[in-house]
Amino acid sequence: MKSMIANYISEDNRFQELDEVFGQENILVTGLSPSAKATIIAEKYLKDHKQMLLVTNNLYQADKIETDILQYVDDSEVYKYPVQDIMTEEFSTQSPQLMSERVRTLTALAQGEKGLFIVPLNGFKKWLTPVDLWKDHQMTLKVGQDIDVDAFLNKLVNMGYRRESVVSHIGEFSLRGGIIDIYPLIGTPVRIELFDTEVDSIRDFDVETQRSNDNINQVEITTASDYIITDEVIQHLQNELKKAYEYTRPKIEKSVRNDLKETYESFKLFESTFFDHQLLRRLVSFMYEKPSTLIDYFQKNAIIVVDEFNRIKETEETLTTEVEDFMSNLIESGNGFIGQGFMKYESFDALLEQHAVAYFTLFTSSMQVPLQHIIKFSCKPVQQFYGQYDIMRSEFQRYVHQDYTVVVLVETETKVERIQSMLNEMHIPTVSNIHEDIDGGQVVVTEGSLSEGFELPYMQLVVITERELFKTRQKKQRKRTKTISNAEKIKSYQDLNVGDYIVHVHHGVGRYLGVETLEVGDTHRDYIKLQYKGTDQLFVPVDQMDQVQKYVASEDKSPRLNKLGGTEWKKTKAKVQQSVEDIADELIDLYKEREMSVGYQYGQDTAEQSAFEHDFPYELTPDQSKSIDEIKGDMERARPMDRLLCGDVGYGKTEVAVRAAFKAVMDGKQVAFLVPTTILAQQHYETLLERMQDFPVEIQLVSRFRTAKEIRETKEGLKSGYVDIVVGTHKLLGKDIQYKDLGLLIVDEEQRFGVRHKERIKTLKKNVDVLTLTATPIPRTLHMSMLGVRDLSVIETPPENRFPVQTYVLEQNTNFIKEALERELSRDGQVFYLYNKVQSIYEKREQLQRLMPDANIAVAHGQMTERDLEETMLSFINHEYDILVTTTIIETGVDVPNANTLIIEEADRFGLSQLYQLRGRVGRSSRIGYAYFLHPANKVLNETAEERLQAIKEFTELGSGFKIAMRDLNIRGAGNLLGKQQHGFIDSVGFDLYSQMLEEAVNEKRGIKEESPDAPDIEVELHLDAYLPAEYIQSEQAKIEIYKKLRKVETEEQLFDVKDELIDRFNDYPIEVERLLDIVEIKVHALHAGVELIKDKGKSIQIILSPKATEDINGEELFKQTQPLGRAMKVGVQNNAMNVTLTKSKQWLDSLKFLVRCIEESMAIKDED
């Protein structure tokens, strides 16, 4: 498709006339619709293959035109310089996504790459790093190259990288021994191993496992920020800032001069101690002697295209006023300096005076720029058919008769075949082989997608998309923006940090104080140091670390510490044990009951089912497909289904449920879709109607929005079997509703129903298939204990065209709020404004109304009557309001695809899981969502709040919540699954221990023998310094991770693997680590030989075998193998256990390793037959 439309256009006279002057002189091109314009621009780029700059008035327009251009130009050649709005960018902590796109763009330009660069106005005017300085900081490292390590590390800091002990996020680097790890903004994390100052090897590595993979010969390291800050820049900044401070001070009110002094001092302090790019970017106008703008990065022969010039001029005017107001507010309040700015004040067109510019506008209008040519195109919109086949047939026939070339773009290969056969049935000839020459009067159906179709009458060309045929939305063309791996979303909530609460299986809740190396006797070992009540401390040898878990409970709860040696912990554990046993009994009864009961067994999928599923306009995610298969498998079995489908907000649970409902209807069964609120009922009802409009399925709704007459008719229809699917609130559970043949009950968010309703659902479950949907994740640990009791399906992958919500953490400021509101409303979107104080919520609305006089603003809170609240929400969904000022009542369940900006005041007061769920309200369509978490300006955040906001910022990836925020939700989910009263028990022993106890109880009741996950304990006591010294591994977390791995080693292969990892991550290891590995090696062989104890007696080593191993060993073989040890080895038997003594010599450790290996090899292998 890329070449076909473009080729067709390139041969047209009108395009050739345009091509001659395009990029040579100032021209105006008018009359083209957005997708036709994208087509012409893309064709010009493909033909000339030079750098091309395309300026739009805002990021929304840039995104829109980019989507269409990507249909023609390969995504490796399309670049965007995404800037939201200048002030928010400079004053907030931002997600790395946009930053990496900006860095990619600047780097490509600085290296003279060809490409089509799309830039919104505020990105075009922004002050940037001088081009030469940027070029100096492009680094390519090659194997064999000699580097000055200090200068190299210094350069990384200039480029915006942060030094950490372990690299886990974009923009970090670490140095351990001779190993440098770097996670660049573009590309994969790399590990550089040095031999003195020479680059010995470069490998990419995985941040999740910290292991390196393939060797590479060279790596390009891009900057981690769009500003480069060197020592010279800091020097220049200090001088300029001092001048600005001295100039500003006398010009402002005396009352705020102290504030100005504080602002100045804080910046000065910041520069001298540790400069943070996020903070210093506010001072960009003082940083460089001659800052650049984006146009300075382009080559002289670049082609410049401006989209809708007059609209850009309007935006520029607003932008200039906004920045000036913003800065004067800062200056007047003592928070800013005269001369502090972010962009070039020269007008936009003045920046382009040196270049020939092609201006594209839809209508011809007067423009204040010199023009040499005006080229007018005639372009018509395409008829919207929306599935009306008669109109479609007559229009297509008209095109064919008039010798038009018609190109129909559809999104998948299967749809190509379906549309072709549909058109062939209308007797319209179609072609699918787009490589042959296309004649007029033909219809080509091919894969592709544009935002809309267009008709160019002069060229006799019509392009029609699915949107015109069937009203489906364009699928977003994904660009290769780097998605952040799960590892980065925050390693795991199990990471132990000093000060964390822990649970020791035998001693209870304590506090983790770190790893300490202690000298006991003459040997050094590592111990985990724990603090208990009062001054009690416990040192746990690292090889017993599996008895210590991180304490995880409901959000932000601090537990009481236990007393060492007290009875309190024993009592607590006994109570919890009783409770999990009761639950286990309940679960087992339920399990037996389900196995015994018989329900309806559905048949295999029908042809209608396949047609219905093909109709879905999006690709299913792998998790959705798996869930659908699991549900259909349940339905096709005789026992009733009871499955829980859990997936993050907006991950496509509804589509899975809709397919199950359709399957039930095709087998002549009725379906009840039960939801907690009237609004959700309305939304699900509309979804079902839209999805099933082409199939003979009768769908009805029972809710307060229906008249008594409609509800009466629905009830009759359910009783007679006329109604196939009914959607409704708890009214569906009423005694007055009778079904002719109910086959499937779908329950959305069961935990939100009352006790009475839950009981009614329980009775229905006995002989009807039940599918329950929930957005609260169910913890993995519970999946295991629930296996076979309640079936679970999990959707963890987001749909293809969902974008991460761009998350900003900002100080509260009216300018930011106004800007965010204006940006969303300018793209015809809506805003959730979260204000959690009911008593002053109406004042907040008035305040916002003064900021945005033209906006329609509504209020929603929990003290309104249910009817008022529902009507307000419905009006908001129907876009009667632009802004909804609301409390946390929106946390669950409402889907407003058009609301894509969320602003939360005092975000520092919210819990992590709450912020995560609230943020899931936006970014639900294919538009990018924005979330602004505001905290009061002069308030010092407490540590927890700061960590929380930091975490939110880091999980800007979709669904990344399955990590840290999910900790709290997991516990909530566990409570929902097991009953609210379990919350207290979970909190008393911590979530992990609770899950473990539950799993053991369930398995015991089901008669399943627990396979020990860890190796049986072999006591090895040797007088050796065997530990991980702090000089070798600085990070305590990394230390604990390695000790955990060593504890699980059961084979030589696994041991080699850990050795490789140590060398890979921390370089060659010292003697203490070698001794530690020797002990693990001895344990591995001892484990397979049935050895129970290896003990250092001073002059000899004692080895005791288990009675079973004593029976199994082949004594003759052992003596034969151990001959080299001579008299150093003695063997005896005591209490049915073999006792081997090894006299110590100089090389006693090697002798011991040899001996244990011999014992293992002497075990008699039983014949299999």
UniProtKB/Swiss-Prot annotation:
It is found in: Cytoplasm. ATP binds at G647, D648, V649, G650, Y651, G652, K653, T654. The keyword Signal does not apply. It is an enzyme of class 3 (hydrolase). Coiled coil: none annotated. SUPFAM superfamilies: CarD-like, P-loop containing nucleoside triphosphate hydrolases, TRCF domain-like. Residues 809-970 form the Helicase C-terminal domain. SMART domains: CarD_TRCF (SM01058), DEXDc (SM00487), HELICc (SM00490), TRCF (SM00982). Keywords: ATP-binding, Cytoplasm, DNA damage, DNA repair, DNA-binding, Helicase, Hydrolase, Nucleotide-binding. One of its GO terms (cellular component) is cytoplasm. In the N-terminal section; belongs to the UvrB family. Couples transcription and DNA repair by recognizing RNA polymerase (RNAP) stalled at DNA lesions. Mediates ATP-dependent release of RNAP and its truncated transcript from the DNA, and recruitment of nucleotide excision repair machinery to the damaged site. This is Transcription-repair-coupling factor.
